[in-house]
From Swiss-Prot:
Keywords: Amino-acid biosynthesis, Aromatic amino acid biosynthesis, Decarboxylase, Lyase, Tryptophan biosynthesis. Pathway: Amino-acid biosynthesis; L-tryptophan biosynthesis; L-tryptophan from chorismate: step 4/5. PROSITE patterns: IGPS. One of its GO terms (biological process) is L-tryptophan biosynthetic process. Its EC number is 4.1.1.48. This is Indole-3-glycerol phosphate synthase. Signal peptide: none annotated. It holds the Pfam family IGPS. It comes from Campylobacter concisus (strain 13826).
Amino acid sequence: MILDEIIKKTKEDLKKRKADYPQEWLGRSLAYNPYVPRDVLGALRASKSEPIKIIAEIKKASPSKGMIREDFEPIKIAQEYEQYANAFSILTEPHWFKGNIEYITQVRRYASRPILRKDFIVDKYQILEALVYGADFILLIAKALTQGELKELLEYAHHLGLEVLVETHDASDVKKAVFAGANIIGINHRNLDDFTMDMGLCEKLVPLLPNGKIIVAESGLYEYEQLRELSKIGVDAFLIGEHFMRQDDIKSAVKKIKEGE
C-alpha cells in the first residue's frame, strides 16, 4: 500500500535529518524565529459573507497522477492564489510529491495567507520544522497514526501555536480526530491506499462531527457547483490542488470555483 511505503521512507529520511541537525538545535532556533503563526481558524471558518473558503495547494506531482505541473514556481503560484484563496497548502514530501520544505519559507516572504505544511508527519521533529520554516498549520493523517500518536502530535503542535488539519477517510478516522481534540477535520474523498475516490464521503461523515468543528473537503474538486452543494451540508473549506495546478490562468480558476463566475 502506497501510504505504508511513504511513511516508511519518511521515517528513513527523518532519521538522517535528525542525525544531521538534532532536534535540540532545531528547538534552539525558535528563539530567533521571525514567524508567528497566523489565525488559521478565522481564515477557514465559513461565514455568511464568505460561505466558501479555499485552501489552494502548491503541488508539483503526486503518486496518483505523476508530474502535474512542469513550470513549477511556488512564489509565482502563491501570488496568483493570493487574492481569492484563504490559505495555502504546500507539499513538502520530496519523493512522491517532489516537494521541499524550503517552499514554505519562500512563499511566506511574498504572500500573506496562512500556510499548511502538507506532509506525512509522524514525529515532533517535523512539527518543529514546520514552525521554523514558517508554516501556520500542519497535516496529520488519522490513518497513519495510532490514537495515542495522533493526540500527542496534535497537542504538541497546539503547544507551539500551530493549528492542525486532521485528515480522515472513514468513520473510524473521524472518531480518532474528534477524540484527539482536532479543531479542523479534513474529509479526503481519495483513499490513500488504492487511490479510489468516493465523492459522496462528506455526506456520510459530516453528520458524525460535533458542532463547531471546521470541516475541510479534499480531493476531486473542480467546479463551483460541487463546493456550493457541500457547503450546504456544513463543509467550511475546500482543499484544491491538481485542478489549479493544471490551469494556465490560476488566479481566474480560483475566482471561478469560489464565486461561480
